[in-house]
Amino acid sequence: PYVVTENCIKCKYQDCVEVCPVDCFYEGENFLVINPDECIDCGVCNPECPAEAIAGKWLEINRKFADLWPNITRKGPALADADDWKDKPDKTGLLSENPGKGTVCH
């Protein structure tokens, strides 16, 4: 299955969320994850990510946080300093385990 890698940390562009046919993205404070048990491996999210953060790695991190964070089904704003962080390597230590807001349905 596809998962989100460290390139997403401190960016969280969310273009991928809108194209996912099965709503398998979950939102943390500064990172998104894909629930690998829900992902159907269609790959439509991969080319949508400006940070090139979607790949076949990081499976366990995505599985862990998909169980803890709220589901996200609509695109929201990227983090304010996303462009500053987009191409920086070695962001794993910056990953916040705090949940994001998720998608609130009214």
From Swiss-Prot:
Residues 80-106 are annotated as: Disordered. GO terms for molecular function: 3 iron, 4 sulfur cluster binding; 4 iron, 4 sulfur cluster binding; electron transfer activity; metal ion binding. The keyword Repeat applies. Binds 1 [4Fe-4S] cluster. Binds 1 [3Fe-4S] cluster. Disulfide bonds: none annotated. [4Fe-4S] cluster binds at residues 20, 39, 42, 45. It holds the Pfam family Fer4. Residues 2-29, 30-59 form the 4Fe-4S ferredoxin-type domain. [3Fe-4S] cluster binds at residues 8, 16, 49. Its cofactor is [4Fe-4S] cluster; [3Fe-4S] cluster. The keyword Acyltransferase does not apply. Keywords: 3Fe-4S, 4Fe-4S, Electron transport, Iron, Iron-sulfur, Metal-binding, Repeat, Transport. SUPFAM superfamilies: 4Fe-4S ferredoxins. Ferredoxins are iron-sulfur proteins that transfer electrons in a wide variety of metabolic reactions. This is Ferredoxin-2.
